[in-house]
């Protein structure tokens, strides 16, 4: 269902070009120059390609761990077999609720507002289940793709003003997994996430 977990230089450069992101100057045609100027330009070109520091091994391992966990399309007997965990405009059944995920991804100063929602049965679920389903929906748009940890939070908002915050850079805490939430009481899910430009393939 998902792309193999990988981050190749060609994908990185393609992603940068597709987003129109430029670091340290603008792309253009260099004027004719002597050898010393050409060498200087070559160094600048290499610097432009290195848009961020290479992530350390521990960060890469954590991103992979998060991807491996949240990319699974099943959790406690619930599954995405009917594609209810990704965007849908299908009419709802009487026992279903559609929860809208509203927010932004910020990439190198550019803000994206992807359109998404999830469709759940009206029932009491655990925070572990809800956390998994919501992050699964975000992975379908690129969360945890690449080698850098995202920054920012995902917030589950209830109709009575309650909030449950999910920190995108780490797993849900064990002591919160069994918190019970009625899906019919959820108002929406909001998010404000910042992704590494190196890891963006789709938003």
Swiss-Prot record:
GO terms for cellular component: extracellular region. Its main location: secreted. Plays a role in the inhibition of the host innate immune system. Inhibits phagocytosis and killing by human neutrophils by interacting with multiple neutrophil surface glycoproteins in a sialic acid-dependent manner. It is found in: Secreted. It comes from Staphylococcus aureus (strain Newman). It comes from the Bacteria. InterPro entries: SuperAg_toxin_C (IPR016091), Toxin_b-grasp_Staph/Strep (IPR006123). The keyword Secreted applies. Induction: Under the control of the Staphylococcus aureus exotoxin expression (Sae) two component gene regulatory system. This is Enterotoxin-like toxin X. Changing residue 167 to A: Loss of interaction with neutrophils. The C-terminal domain contains a V-shape binding site for sialyl Lewis X. Residues 164-180 are annotated as: Sialic acid-binding motif. Belongs to the staphylococcal/streptococcal toxin family. The keyword DNA-binding does not apply. Keywords: Secreted. Signal peptide: none annotated. The gene is selX.
């Amino acid at each position: 269902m998902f792309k193999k977990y990988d981050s190749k230089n060609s994908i990185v450069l393609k992603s940068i070009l597709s987003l129109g992101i430029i670091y340290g100057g603008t792309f253009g045609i260099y004027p004719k120059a002597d050898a010393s100027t050409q060498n200087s330009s070559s160094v600048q070109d290499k610097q432009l390609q290195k848009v961020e520091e290479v992530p350390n091994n521990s960060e890469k391992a954590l991103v992979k761990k998060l991807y491996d966990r949240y990319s699974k399309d099943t959790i406690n007997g619930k599954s995405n077999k009917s594609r209810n965990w990704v965007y849908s405009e299908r009419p709802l059944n009487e026992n279903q609720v559609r929860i809208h995920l509203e927010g932004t991804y910020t990439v190198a100063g550019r803000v994206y507002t992807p359109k998404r929602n999830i469709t759940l049965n009206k029932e009491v679920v655990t925070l572990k289940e809800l956390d998994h389903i919501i992050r699964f929906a975000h992975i379908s748009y690129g969360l945890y793709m690449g080698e850098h940890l995202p920054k920012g939070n995902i917030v589950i908002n209830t109709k009575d003003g309650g909030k449950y915050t999910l920190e995108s850079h780490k797993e849900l805490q064990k002591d919160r997994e069994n918190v019970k939430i009625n899906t019919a009481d959820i108002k929406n899910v909001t998010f404000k996430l910042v992704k590494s430009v190196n890891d963006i393939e789709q938003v």
